[in-house]
Amino acid sequence: MSADTRFESLKAIVPAVSRETANRLIAFEDLFRKWSKAINLASPSTLNELWTRHILDSAQLFPLASDAKHWLDIGSGGGFPGIVTACFLAEQPGGAIDLIESAGKKAAFLRTAAGHLHVPARVHSTRIEAMWEKIETPQVVTARALASLNDLFGLTELWLTNGAKALFQKGRDYQREIDESRVGWSFDLVQHQSAIDQASVILEITNLRRKVA
C-alpha cells in the first residue's frame, strides 16, 4: 500500500487529518514492524493488516473527542491506540497523552516511538493502580483489548468518577459486558459502530458511579 493510499484511507476515518499526521503514522507503522521482529507487540497474524487492523482502528477514536487535550491510555501494549492518538495530539497546542504499560519491553518501545515521532506521550512503566494518585484526571481515558468492561471500570474509577470520559473499544461480546457491568455500576453510554470491524464498537462512557449495595 502506497503512502498516498494510506493517507486516503486515513482521511476516510478522520477527514480533517493532515498529511503531517499521516506521515507520522506511516513512520510509526515502519517502526512497529522493525520492533516486532524482536518482541511480541501484536498478534503475528494481524501484521499483514497492520495499517487497517491496528492503526486505522485506533485512529477512529480521536474524532470522538478531538477537542480534548489531556488523554490517558491504559494497558498501552504496542501503542494502540495510545501512540496513534499521540500522533494526532502532536498538532494540538498543549495536547498530551499518558501511556501506562507494565511490561518493560513494550514500555521501552513506546518511549522509543514517542521520541522517534516527536509526539507528546509520557510513558509510565508500572501498573495502572500505581498511577491512580499520580495522574491528574484526564479528559479522555482509552483502552483497547485490555480487560472486561467491569474490570476496566475498577481500574479507571478514580478518573471516570471525577469527570473523565471513557472511549473503550470492544469486540462482539460487548453487549454481554455492558449488561454485566450494569449490575454494579451506573453510567451514561453512547455506542459508536466501529468503522473498521462491523462486529466491534466504541463505548463512550460518562458519569460513572459505583452502585451502593
From Swiss-Prot:
| Enzyme Commission numbers on file | 2.1.1.170
Q: Name one Pfam family in it.
A: GidB
Q: Cite the InterPro entries for this sequence.
A: rRNA_ssu_MeTfrase_G, SAM-dependent_MTases_sf
Species of the source:
Brucella anthropi (strain ATCC 49188 / DSM 6882 / CCUG 24695 / JCM 21032 / LMG 3331 / NBRC 15819 / NCTC 12168 / Alc 37)
Name listed for the protein in its UniProt record:
Ribosomal RNA small subunit methyltransferase G
Q: Return one GO MF term.
A: rRNA (guanine-N7-)-methyltransferase activity
Q: Does the keyword Cytoplasm apply?
A: yes
Q: Which domain of life is it from?
A: Bacteria
Q: Which family does it belong to?
A: Belongs to the methyltransferase superfamily. RNA methyltransferase RsmG family.
Give the signal peptide as a residue range, or say none if absent: none
Under catalytic activity, the entry for this protein gives: guanosine(527) in 16S rRNA + S-adenosyl-L-methionine = N(7)-methylguanosine(527) in 16S rRNA + S-adenosyl-L-homocysteine
Please spell out the taxonomic lineage of the organism that makes this protein: Bacteria, Pseudomonadati, Pseudomonadota, Alphaproteobacteria, Hyphomicrobiales
Q: What does this protein do?
A: Specifically methylates the N7 position of guanine in position 527 of 16S rRNA.
Does the keyword Kinase feature in the UniProt annotation?
A: no
HAMAP family this protein is in? 16SrRNA_methyltr_G
Where is S-adenosyl-L-methionine annotated to bind?
Answer: G75, F80, I128, E129, R144
GO CC annotation: cytosol
Listed A to Z, the keywords are: Cytoplasm, Methyltransferase, rRNA processing, S-adenosyl-L-methionine, Transferase
Cell location? Cytoplasm
